[in-house]
Swiss-Prot record:
Residues 76-79 are annotated as: G3. It is found in: Cytoplasm. Mg(2+) binds at T26. It catalyses: GTP + H2O = GDP + phosphate + H(+). InterPro entries: EF-Tu_GTP-bd, EF-Tu_GTPase, EFTu-like_2, EFTU_2, G_TR_CS, P-loop_NTPase, Small_GTP-bd, T_Tr_GTP-bd_dom. SUPFAM superfamilies: EF-Tu/eEF-1alpha/eIF2-gamma C-terminal domain, P-loop containing nucleoside triphosphate hydrolases, Translation proteins. Its EC number is 3.6.5.3. Residues 169-171 are annotated as: G5. This is Elongation factor Tu. GTP binds at residues 19-26, 76-80, 131-134. The lineage of its organism: Bacteria, Pseudomonadati, Pseudomonadota, Alphaproteobacteria, Hyphomicrobiales. It comes from Bartonella henselae (strain ATCC 49882 / DSM 28221 / CCUG 30454 / Houston 1) (Rochalimaea henselae). Residues 131-134 are annotated as: G4.
Amino acid sequence: MAKSKFERTKPHVNIGTIGHVDHGKTSLTAAITKYFGEFKAYDQIDAAPEERARGITISTAHVEYETEKRHYAHVDCPGHADYVKNMITGAAQMDGAILVVSAADGPMPQTREHILLARQVGVPAIVVFLNKVDQVDDAELLELVELEVRELLSKYDFPGDDIPIVKGSALAALEDKDKSIGEDAVRLLMSEVDNYIPTPERPVDQPFLMPIEDVFSISGRGTVVTGRVERGVIKVGEEVEIIGIRPTSKTTVTGVEMFRKLLDQGQAGDNIGALLRGIDREGIERGQVLAKPASVTPHTRFKAEAYILTKDEGGRHTPFFTNYRPQFYFRTTDVTGIVTLPEGTEMVMPGDNVAMDVSLIVPIAMEEKLRFAIREGGRTVGAGIVSKIIE
């Protein structure tokens, strides 16, 4: 029987499986599709296609499914390096994550690293699936593993005591064995995900922001800036701030056009031209943003989590040290910045992910979770995300 088309009336949420290698992320992903979507077998998911995001090649598998409440897009990555790259580049946005931990092994190094990354890149909520419980006979041992997972989550500032932990076996679900730890556990997991992972605010409901890509002057009409509206709505007659690179200034949008047609407003996702009152061609440049007044501020210093490309990925061939000065590509432009490595980190090798402090030579409209590429002479050598603003 043909599957009915996905109902787009439901709220849409992006999630993904995270956790240590071989703890069962891909098996769980397959099991979820079995009950909530169009079934995808383990090897269909495991053979993930390569994609490029911010100049970086990443293997990611995408599946979709739906519960009674929501429609989900779910990402699963075959290798650990793909997770690191995925989370840092935001290639696959995650509104929440399912952390898969093998009950037989407990938390392992990548369990910890994925939780830390989730914290750094701002994944809002995590639900835990304690997998392979059929391999543990001792109830006390299971309790101990659960406690360990909760402590680890709390250590990285997730509410470890409140996070739902569902115990089950992805394999049992796939093989239609022991229903209580198979199908029932997967159904319980998705009901926890439905209830615990918040529905993200839609981009149109957020405050207006548009990165400026190009500036034109139109004789007799004034200056037009073009770009794709990142979030929010802009209506003709509204006041906006021009932020970044230079001192912040204010102007009024006197016209919005799209495909040469005049509109009364532009909204998230639209490629528009905005006519600005009283701004000359020299008063504004690519790399600045138009934004709702007081919604975003310019900054030069921040902490970042970054992934540095390997030589094979087209990155650097050599390590870098404190005082490294590459370009940081934010939204539409490159800005030079100076890197300070954390204490105890001598150097960063190609292929590493690293927490670092960055000081830009000019301010950029910035907030936490903003992504950037690290470039040298136009060539991407890394990717990062703002984890904390310093000044």
